[in-house]
Amino acid sequence: MSRGLVILDRDGVINYDSEYFIKSTNEWHPIDGSLEGIARLSRAGFDIAVATNQSGIGRKLLDVATLESIHQKMLAAARKAGGDIGKIVYCPHLPTAGCDCRKPQPGLLLQLSRNYSVPLTGVPIVGDSVRDIDAAVAAGGRPILVRTGNGTQSEAALAKRGLEIDVYDDLAQFAEAFVNQTR
């Protein structure tokens, strides 16, 4: 039986990000400790889902089949570490599309709420960017910032806004703390 849902961003939280986008399986590299963090959450009985902006599709830098291959590599790496990612949702649109699925809009998170039949109140939504945090707030979840990826810059920007959120060095540190808090 699940102990609850944890939602993760992908680039900058699970894997290293690139200003040029992750366009192939060869460019996908996990951040140290991220797969172990996923495994820790899985072993503790949490469902794990990923919500990620992937405008590289809209920019024609990669196609859906390539994105699916990248996700298969990520899923296999998580499984090998002892973790399980149950669902991945993504927004393929350009930032100018005006869709409701591109973070900071809450559409992807609300989709996961429907998929798992759970309200997002109290659900940790882990990201490394201001838009991840804004989406978490808009969806009514519990925003969590990690300092990997764009996290350090985002922490400074969020501090200027006076938004108080939990901040961790990386996904592994969050997972350890969260599992210990929920025992």
Across the structure, where does each feature detected by a protein language model lie?
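Active-site loop signature of alpha/beta-hydrolase-fold enzymes
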Residues: 13-15, 57, 132, 151
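A short alpha-helix capping/helix-coil boundary motif
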Residues: 14-18, 53-55, 87-90, 110-113
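Short acidic, glycine/proline-rich loop/turn micro-motifs
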Residues: 18-22, 60-61, 156-158
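Generic enzyme active-site microenvironment
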Residues: 7-9, 51, 126, 168
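Substrate-recognition element of Asp-dependent hydrolases with the DxDx(T/V) motif
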Residues: 34, 38-71, 84-97, 136
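Asp-based, Mg2+/Mn2+-dependent phosphohydrolase catalytic module
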Residues: 2, 64-86, 94-125, 129-183
